[in-house]
């Protein structure tokens, strides 16, 4: 399928000359760099706690502040999570990799350099399949590399015209996931970020908190233009530090149109302009990208091996062991839930929102007679409680097997759906089993036809006027009589069987 899109010169540049109104074709080219904070207990190269929030500059030490004489020590947990991320994204894990210093001067980078990996990254040659709601086809996106690096501090620009720096984030462990330029629309770029977040949160290497910057995306955008038999490319712009899917989608959409407009207004870029990569920021208020600076060349960063850190040497056995911990990924689990358990696409998508939720559901489904009934109950009732209490499902005062028992009682028609809701509330409050509550309160649904028929006859005997009304054509009496039978059974009678027996008895009058 072709990724070329069509446009006309006047629609882009506002031209009025009809000679410029010929159609042209263009292809959007996007590659993403995703920075992901890892869920380690400590920072990457020191023993400071790796937590968000807290008092500014309360979790720092000589190592993350870059004080003279302080030596970094790489965290094994950091490397382990990096390897697991690489395995989940289909990468080859390099048994040898090395750390480098990337030099640049920002106020929030106290060492004057960032510890990263330059030409010897931990992971290479991966790929993920991206499929969004608004994407017509699935796209395979190649991952060029994943490397380890540390985060910088945070600059806070206050209303008093001063800038303040919080170094708590200095040294927080990151991986940078670099894709090949395989994305062909802003929608695909947003879906790629979403897919990466879904996979990495599912295997629990990151919490993926977008608001706190645990996952940030830089998008490299340019356009290939075919016009009157000639091919042109616009210079690459890198849009930095986007922390939401909408931001990625909106920024890339705008940048593509901006580059097309610039091309028609100024003509093809010179060789010098093509070599200069522009760094852009996204202004969500104005809805525009803004030039921040012209990108440094690699030479400007003065990469060098970090003499304070030894090279990383991994064994095949170590990598093999970690591969077992990755487990089944969300896409595969969704497909299995739909194929084997008959779940809808929506149910499968929601229930694979986290590994904890997927595991919890699967335990309940295996213990129950009807996996779809269990899935629907979790989606409608269980998650409502989880969200209301702002807890994870593991903190719920119920086991998966307890929900399975409750659903089987509905499946076997021992209780109604309405009764199940009341019993569920009692289970949450007391921790009691569904069967114990049903037995103690005499809630078991009455399904025996002879017993229900006896109730019907009793109601008929008590309400002869209703029977005469029925004989005179008042058909709504049937519903009223059903209600009386249900009332006499204290709601325990099976509604469908009550309806059948009432209509049978009325037809014999």
From Swiss-Prot:
NCBIfam families per UniProt: gatB, PRK05477.1-2, PRK05477.1-4
Gene Ontology molecular function: asparaginyl-tRNA synthase (glutamine-hydrolyzing) activity; ATP binding; glutaminyl-tRNA synthase (glutamine-hydrolyzing) activity
PROSITE patterns noted in UniProt: GATB
The keyword Ligase is annotated on this UniProt entry: yes
Record note on quaternary structure: Heterotrimer of A, B and C subunits.
Database matches in Gene3D superfamilies: 1.10.10.410, GatB domain, N-terminal subdomain (1.10.150.380)
Official protein name in the record: Aspartyl/glutamyl-tRNA(Asn/Gln) amidotransferase subunit B
Annotated catalysed reactions: L-glutamyl-tRNA(Gln) + L-glutamine + ATP + H2O = L-glutaminyl-tRNA(Gln) + L-glutamate + ADP + phosphate + H(+); L-aspartyl-tRNA(Asn) + L-glutamine + ATP + H2O = L-asparaginyl-tRNA(Asn) + L-glutamate + ADP + phosphate + 2 H(+)
EC assignment: 6.3.5.-
Record function comment: Allows the formation of correctly charged Asn-tRNA(Asn) or Gln-tRNA(Gln) through the transamidation of misacylated Asp-tRNA(Asn) or Glu-tRNA(Gln) in organisms which lack either or both of asparaginyl-tRNA or glutaminyl-tRNA synthetases. The reaction takes place in the presence of glutamine and ATP through an activated phospho-Asp-tRNA(Asn) or phospho-Glu-tRNA(Gln).
Native source species: Treponema pallidum (strain Nichols)
